[in-house]
Amino acid sequence: KIQGDELPWGMQHYKKALKYWHPMMYNHPVTVRSTSVEFRDAGHILGAAIALIKYRGKKICYSGDFKLEKSRLHAGAKTIKEGVDALIIETTYSDRDHPDRKKLEKEFADEIEETVEAGGTVLCPAFAVGRSQELIRIIRAHSKDVPIYLDGMSKAVARIYAKYKKYLCEPDKYVNDLESINIVDSMIARKNATAGGGVIVSTAGMMEGGPAINYVKYLNSESKVVFTGYCMEGTNGWLLQNTGQLRIDNNLLEVDLPVEYKDFSAHAGRSDLLKFIKDANPGKIVCVHGDAERADNFAVELK
């Protein structure tokens, strides 16, 4: 709408599409004619699934986005150990592993404590689905007292996570942590959030829209910005991390604050990708969902 473009679909199209949806539970195969489909928990975000498709004696696994390692929200995916004819697998981080989670959490918590004690605010631009909710759990696991402010689309998603808490690894802890935070629902609440002495978790993760970008203008000199997810080159998040600038209202704003990145990725690292492939023992492998060069290099390596 802002760009003056019209969406090619509307609410009536969504409602029509819903008629053809078939909800499925994890680990419960559904057979249509001669094709069987089973979804397994991918350990990525709420609802993410690894698909196992069987057709006339052949098996195909589509990993989608997955993570084997346990996080604050998910128990982690299990590998496919029955052998498949073809594996379609993500390659987002096929060239490296992620840092140790426990050490990274401790480092993150220590920086929050230092910043808050100095009277500053930690702004965490975060993805609405998954990352925002996990940050709440991480922060609360290390501090019960630091104020947390949740803003943007993350608020609605947080309620959805609570509604489907049975799919989380520690559902009651998530609900308790959610009840302990401040939901930002007005401009006054946003001003209070930047007064210093807390953590703001807000969309958008790449700072392309959402309230996060506007918070930067009101942070005091003791504050800092901490990214916890990938920012595509050319986005405001990438720009801030690499140049110390932000595009706001078609102007470049110099941001004189520390800007950091913590790798709390919800994707499998290189070692887990290799483990998944080894356990699945596929006849063929198709590498997808990654930088083109990275995916090609991984495919060549697997040959």
Enumerate the language-model features and the residues they cover.
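Proline-aspartate-enriched helix->loop->beta-strand connector
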Residues: 277, 281-283
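A general structural motif
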Residues: 99-104, 176-189, 204-208, 243-244, ...
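Redox- and metal-dependent alpha/beta enzyme cores, enriched for Fe-S-associated oxidoreductases
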Residues: 220-254
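Short acidic, glycine/proline-enriched helix-loop-strand junctions
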Residues: 296-303
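His/Asp/Glu-rich metal-coordinating catalytic cores
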Residues: 1-148
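Short, surface-exposed amphipathic charged segments that create phosphate/polyanion-binding patches used
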Residues: 35-40, 160-169, 274-276
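Generic long, charged, amphipathic alpha-helical segments
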Residues: 247-276
